UniProtKB/Swiss-Prot annotation:
Binding residue positions for Mg(2+): S16
Entry keyword annotation includes Phosphoprotein: no
Family, per entry: Belongs to the NifH/BchL/ChlL family.
Keyword Cytoplasm attributed: no
EC number: 1.3.7.7
Originating species: Synechocystis sp. (strain ATCC 27184 / PCC 6803 / Kazusa)
Subunit structure: Homodimer. Protochlorophyllide reductase is composed of three subunits; ChlL, ChlN and ChlB.
Catalysed reaction equations from the record: chlorophyllide a + oxidized 2[4Fe-4S]-[ferredoxin] + 2 ADP + 2 phosphate = protochlorophyllide a + reduced 2[4Fe-4S]-[ferredoxin] + 2 ATP + 2 H2O
Protein name: Light-independent protochlorophyllide reductase iron-sulfur ATP-binding protein
Known role: Component of the dark-operative protochlorophyllide reductase (DPOR) that uses Mg-ATP and reduced ferredoxin to reduce ring D of protochlorophyllide (Pchlide) to form chlorophyllide a (Chlide). This reaction is light-independent. The L component serves as a unique electron donor to the NB-component of the complex, and binds Mg-ATP.
Pathway: Porphyrin-containing compound metabolism; chlorophyll biosynthesis (light-independent)
Cofactor(s) demanded: [4Fe-4S] cluster
First-tier enzyme category under EC: oxidoreductase
Single GO BP term: photosynthesis, dark reaction
Length: 288
């Protein structure tokens, strides 16, 4: 049975880099993986393939939208570690609906029976946009994963994504697998957030520059580690995420949280920071 994942998060948070490394980790665990990029920039799979692959929407336009004239090899490209890659693409900037293209991508892949060929399908979805079109992958997903950092904006975006998961979970067995903290030196705000909106934290990746560099190089951390074994410890973070997903965790249906309440909670963290206990003790001694 195919396990389907949908990766969301604030724009620029590192979803595509995270997705590519999770896909690779799943492949390293012996799974046949398909990663579907759902972003008009069509750069989701760049880290796996090393180049911008042709998009499904471009291929459909070339064939005048005759689905019967398209073969799997026309739209599916082989990436690192044997991960198969698809890019949905999108309309020209400022014209059309990118969410519609996501729907057409799913329709074509179903026509090609591609969904039945894989152990794991991973949707890497544009930013924190959760309109009907870009929320479509949630209709097929078993689990949603939210990429964040220890910052206000990313966690507030996570709240909106969690609300979409809750809505979609009304009609099928979608669950939120948890948060992935990407390139963050702290997790105190993440911990404050999950106190208000309980959900698992799958992994917290430290502030490692090689994660950012891997994106520029068009390589996964696993591929970089082949020539630089010192990076193997970074790969272990992604393998840990893969192992948790493959264990098919229970996950959660996120509880409801009002925007204003969560906004106040997160902003209060910055406006009224609590002093470390050691510092408070020092101040008390000074006052005596």
């Amino acid at each position: 049975m195919t396990l389907t994942l949908a990766v969301y998060g604030k724009g620029g948070i590192g979803k595509s880099t995270t997705s590519c490394n999770i896909s690779t980790a799943l492949a390293k665990r012996g799974k046949k993986v398909l990663q579907i990029g759902c972003d008009p920039k069509h750069d989701s799979t760049f880290t796996l393939t090393g180049f911008l692959i042709p998009t499904i929407i471009d291929t459909l336009q070339e064939k005048d939208f005759h689905y019967e004239d398209i073969w799997p090899e026309d739209v599916i490209y082989k990436g690192y570690a044997g991960v198969d890659c698809v890019e949905a693409g999108g309309p020209p900037a400022g014209a059309g609906c990118g969410g519609y293209v996501v729907g057409e991508t799913v329709k074509l892949l179903k026509e090609l029976n591609a969904f039945d060929e894989y152990d794991v399908i991973l949707f890497d979805v544009l930013g924190d946009v959760v309109c009907g079109g870009f929320a479509a992958p949630l209709n097929y997903a078993d689990y949603c994963l939210i990429v964040t950092d220890n910052g206000f904006d990313a966690l507030f975006a996570a709240k909106r994504i969690a609300a979409s998961v809750r809505e979609k979970a009304r009609t099928h067995s979608l669950r939120l697998a948890g948060l992935i903290g990407n390139r963050t030196s702290k997790r105190d705000l993440i911990d404050k957030y999950i106190e208000a909106v309980p959900m698992p934290v799958l992994e917290i990746l430290p502030l490692i520059e090689d994660i950012r560099v891997s994106r520029v190089k068009g390589k996964t951390l696993f591929e970089m580690a082949e020539s630089d074994p010192s990076l193997n410890y970074v790969c272990d973070y992604y393998l840990n995420i893969a192992d948790q997903i493959l264990s098919q965790p229970e996950g959660v249906v996120p509880k409801d949280a009002q925007d204003r309440d969560l906004f106040s909670l997160l902003s209060d963290f910055y406006l009224n920071p609590t002093q470390p206990a050691s510092q408070t003790k020092e101040l008390d001694l000074m006052m005596v």
